[in-house]
């Protein structure tokens, strides 16, 4: 039973704005208290998310990531609706959103819990910041710098120093995003494993790796020139030599509402890879 729904739309997409209005009206007509807005509005008024039963995200993967960041602290599930090509995150399009909502209101669908990773930035023995990602945490060279040297330790055991454009630590969900483009393996999104992927590494015999779910990955910048820390493609925090980024699985999860059977992942995977 849905009592309160938040509808997140992309303000730069006419299709997303239009559908959000129509969907909000449709939900209200059926007795569902509905709030529509952009991510900044929901960040400024977190109670609008905390009080709802579901957030519907209308847009591409960027909109879904914004919805995830808004919802996982409150354990609120997200229904992603793709405007354009279906993606690895969104399995339904605008033509299915109304029937999908009816299915959910009638008790249908299932919860797809996705692992998150938590990254802590340390400098000189002090923790500067902490971040949570659904897809990946990346240390990469800045636009003007040469390759970066990133020393990687796993569970306090030194692995290697990558001389590369960057290093990715991804969740299983993120294995089909930037990590895949960088040559990493695809991991079933229901897995809690982590994926370590160097980006355009030079002179290394340590390839991409799938790590156990409780692995603690420490990446230390060993380059004199600066690098950047990105979390799900955002933040872009400047790093200096000696900075450490410690990544581990978060105790929190992000929950998606799914309407298709869970065994369709591999069929959908092949179809989307053929299209890309």
From Swiss-Prot:
Family of this protein: Belongs to the NAD kinase family.
Transmembrane segments: none
Keywords recorded for this protein, A-Z: ATP-binding, Cytoplasm, Kinase, NAD, NADP, Nucleotide-binding, Transferase
The protein's Enzyme Commission number: 2.7.1.23
InterPro entries: ATP-NAD_kinase_N (IPR017438), ATP-NAD_kinase_PpnK-typ_C (IPR017437), NAD/diacylglycerol_kinase_sf (IPR016064), NADK (IPR002504)
Entry annotation: catalytic residues: 61
Single GO MF descriptor: NAD binding
Physiological role: Involved in the regulation of the intracellular balance of NAD and NADP, and is a key enzyme in the biosynthesis of NADP. Catalyzes specifically the phosphorylation on 2'-hydroxyl of the adenosine moiety of NAD to yield NADP.
Location in the cell: Cytoplasm
Binding site for NAD(+): 61-62, 66, 135-136, 146, 163, 165, 200
One GO CC term on file: cytoplasm
Catalytic activity: NAD(+) + ATP = ADP + NADP(+) + H(+)
One Pfam family of this chain: NAD_kinase
Required cofactor names: a divalent metal cation
The keyword Nucleotide-binding appears for this protein: yes
Any one biological process term the GO annotation gives: NAD metabolic process
Protein name: NAD kinase
Keyword Cytoplasm: yes
């Amino acid at each position: 039973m849905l009592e309160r729904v938040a509808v997140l739309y992309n303000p730069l997409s006419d299709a997303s704005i239009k559908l959000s209005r129509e969907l909000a009206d449709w939900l209200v007509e059926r007795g569902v208290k509905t709030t529509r807005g952009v991510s900044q509005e929901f960040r400024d008024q977190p109670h609008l998310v905390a009080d709802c039963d579901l957030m519907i995200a209308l847009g591409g993967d960027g909109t879904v990531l914004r919805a995830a960041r808004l919802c996982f602290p409150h354990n609120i599930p997200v229904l992603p609706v793709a405007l354009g090509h279906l993606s690895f995150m969104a399995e339904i399009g605008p033509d299915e959103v109304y029937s999908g909502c009816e299915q959910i209101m009638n008790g249908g669908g299932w919860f797809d819990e996705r692992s998150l990773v938590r990254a802590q930035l340390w400098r000189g023995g002090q923790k500067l910041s902490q971040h949570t990602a659904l897809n990946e945490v990346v240390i990469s060279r800045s636009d003007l710098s040469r390759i970066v040297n990133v020393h990687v330790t796993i569970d306090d055991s030194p692995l290697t120093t990558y001389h590369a454009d960057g290093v990715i630590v991804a969740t299983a969900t993120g294995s089909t995003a930037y990590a895949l483009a960088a040559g990493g393996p695809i991991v079933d999104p229901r897995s809690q494993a982590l994926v370590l992927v160097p980006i355009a590494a030079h002179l290394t015999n340590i390839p991409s790796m799938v790590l156990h779910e409780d692995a603690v990955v420490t990446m230390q910048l060993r380059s004199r020139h600066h690098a950047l820390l990105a979390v799900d493609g955002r933040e872009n925090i400047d790093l200096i030599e000696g900075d450490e980024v410690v990544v581990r699985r978060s105790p929190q999860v992000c929950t998606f509402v799914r309407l298709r059977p869970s065994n369709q992942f591999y069929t959908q995977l092949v179809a989307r890879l053929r299209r890309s």
